[in-house]
Regions:
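H-loop/switch region of ABC-family ATPase nucleotide-binding domains
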Residues: 173-175
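ABC ATPase nucleotide-binding domain signature region
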Residues: 44-87
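A short, flexible loop at the N-terminus of ABC-type nucleotide-binding domains that lies
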Residues: 1-5, 9-23
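Conserved beta-strand-loop-alpha-helix hinge in the C-terminal portion
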Residues: 193-217
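Walker B catalytic motif
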Residues: 114, 143-145
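Hydrophobic anchor residue at the start of the ABC signature
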Residues: 128
Length: 220
C-alpha cells in the first residue's frame, strides 16, 4: 500500500541555523517506516511538523506520541486519559489485556494508578497502551524504546506489526537497530535534510549504506 508524505518545512526563531526541509516522499512498503539520524538531525521536528500540518485534515491526520510524555499524558491516570479522548465507553477487558501485554503485573490496578507515581519506563509503556487502544489510522512514535526493556521492545514490535497489518500507517523515530531492521522503509536525516530514503531491504543490501552514520545503535 503506497503512501505519500507531504513536503515539510520548519524553522525556529531561537535557532535560525537549523531548517527542516523535506520534499514530498513516497513510501512503498507494507510495514512501518523508520526515521533515523544522529541527535539534532531533525527527527523529532519531522514528526512534530507532520502531525501539526495534518491536524486540521481528519482524512490525513497523524497521531503523534512524543519523546517527552508530559505533553501527552495530560490526565491523572489511564482510565481518565482514555475517557477524555473517547466518546464511547471503554472496553475494559480489551484495555486490561493491552496493559498486561505491555508487561504490567497488576493490569487492573494500573487503570487508576497515577502517572506521576510511575517510573519513566512505566509511563512510556502506559502511553503505548493508550495509543494501541486508540488504534489511530496514522501514528508517529518518537523513540518508543526509551526506558523500555529488550523483552518489552519485542512485544512492542509485535504490536506494531499487528497495527500495520490492519492498514495503520506507522512512522517510528528510533536509534534501535531492531526497529530499523524490521521496518519497510527508512528515511535518513542529516541537519534537517533528507540524506537518503528507500525500502529497508534495498538500503541494507547496499554496501555503501551505514546505519551507524545515522546514530543507529546495535547494543540494544
Amino acid at each position: 500500500m503506497n503512501h505519500t508524505l507531504p513536503a515539510l518545512s520548519k524553522r525556529y526563531s531561537d535557532n535560525p541555523t537549523f531548517i527542516l526541509e523535506s520534499p514530498e516522499l513516497s513510501l512503498s512498503g507494507e510495514g512501518y517506516t523508520c526515521i533515523i539520524g544522529i541527535n539534532g538531525s531533525g527527527k523529532s521536528t519531522f514528526g512534530e511538523t507532520l502531525a501539526e500540518i495534518s491536524a486540521n485534515n481528519p482524512g490525513e491526520k497523524w497521531y503523534y506520541l512524543p519523546q517527552h510524555l508530559d505533553r501527552f499524558l495530560f490526565a491523572e491516570n489511564l482510565s481518565e486519559q482514555l475517557s477524555a479522548l473517547l466518546s464511547q465507553e471503554i472496553n475494559q477487558p480489551r484495555l486490561i489485556s493491552l496493559i498486561e501485554e505491555l508487561g504490567f503485573s497488576d493490569p487492573q490496578g494500573m487503570l487508576h494508578f497515577p502517572f506521576l507515581l510511575m517510573s519513566g519506563g512505566e509511563r512510556r509503556r502506559m502511553a503505548l497502551v493508550c495509543v494501541f487502544y486508540l488504534e489511530p489510522v496514522r501514528l508517529i512514535l518518537d523513540e518508543p524504546e526509551i526506558g523500555v526493556t529488550a523483552k518489552e521492545n519485542m512485544v512492542l514490535l509485535s504490536k506494531l506489526h499487528n497495527l500495520t497489518g490492519k492498514n495503520t500507517r506507522v512512522i517510528i523515530i528510533s536509534h534501535n537497530a531492531a526497529f530499523v531492521r524490521q521496518s519497510s522503509d527508512i528515511i535518513c536525516l542529516i541537519n534537517g535534510k533528507i540524506a537518503r530514503t528507500g525500502q529497508t531491504k534495498d538500503l541494507l543490501s547496499d554496501p555503501t549504506f551505514e546505519l551507524e552514520k545515522y546514530g543507529v545503535r546495535f547494543s540494544q
